[in-house]
Amino acid sequence: MTALSPCTLNATQELSLAYSMRLGMPQLALGGLSEAWLLMECGHRHWTLLERMLGVEARCMYDDRGCRMYASFVAVHESGASLAHFQEADEIVLESRIAALTSKRVLSSHFITGRGRVRIDMISAFVRKARPSDTDTEVLHGAEWDRPGIRPLCPLAEIDSSLPALDRQIRRGLDGDYMGLSLQPSGLSPAFVCRPCPAIDFNGVGLLYFARYIDFVDRAEWECMLAADGSRLATVERRIFYFANLSPGDSVKVELAGGPGSLGRMEHLSRISRVSDGRQMALVYTRKQCTRA
């Protein structure tokens, strides 16, 4: 990077990353591999590969109006082995690749291999703020960042991922159940409300960090559904669909449908919304498994 000009990247670099590492406490949680760390790491790798794809550093991405462009996640799917399969001092390999879905959306896939194998797919779209202080953003079209120095997105004919179809299904609207779960008021747990902390939950541009959404879901699960024996649950699958952000000082409300099942399983569908205006911020489907008998 030091040999390159401040705002351009080497166009000959491969649009993939791979490295191995040894797991320590920063990468682990009580139930195995830390899901929060994993999302943050894969998110960072997504943005790194996106810079290579467009040929420009993220801090230098501006649209045709001169507004800063941000790669905002719209959907994330985590699947594969339980995170409980990963333990301290394990050697893992993390492989990532990226491809354009459309002229305005990008998909990255990340494979974490150790005692088990986990896959995380992530879709992002470019957004901008009307003013730097805004938290609501608007999605940009390809022509709006068609500027010298930024390479256009060239969609692939075939994508090896189920996430685009899952995302389209959600954005058509939930008229009934999803994965056998319904968010009708009669089936919801008591609402969990909390106020995100600016020093912990927001990123450097003032937006609620994408990886924090599941923190609120897990806190709601812990407060509303679990007894002490729920501390050994580990995630097996997570689907996150993002719709909106919020301002520092605002609060979030989490509503859950579902709950503990047989054989140590947990499955629920959650809706995250803003307390200030009731706007839906995200829908999250979660499936977990107890790590002990």
Task: List each model region and its residues.
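Generic alpha-helix signal with a bias toward terminal, lower-confidence helices
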Residues: 50, 54, 131-138, 214, ...
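Bulky hydrophobic/aromatic packing residues
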Residues: 62-64, 126, 143, 214
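Acidic/His-leaning functional-site neighborhoods
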Residues: 177-255, 261-269, 280
